[in-house]
């Protein structure tokens, strides 16, 4: 179980990193929103902004947070790391 004092590292899958770079290039407002949500996720992986929710079915074990009405951040959490797997669209591409 994660405690409040745990400091988690962030990693991106290759696809998620490309999506982040695309947001950085095309939509600075969304980039700032993503950065804010990532920072909050580091502090509180399962609560906080973006309405965190555990995913089900083929994405069981992952969590999502709303970036806006169309896009979600999908991520997994271990005892040492938050891995971001998706930053565009709604769960499945």
Predicted regions and their residues:
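Compact soluble domain cores
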Residues: 31-49
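Enriched for short, Lys/Arg-rich terminal
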Residues: 1-9, 15-32, 49, 56, ...
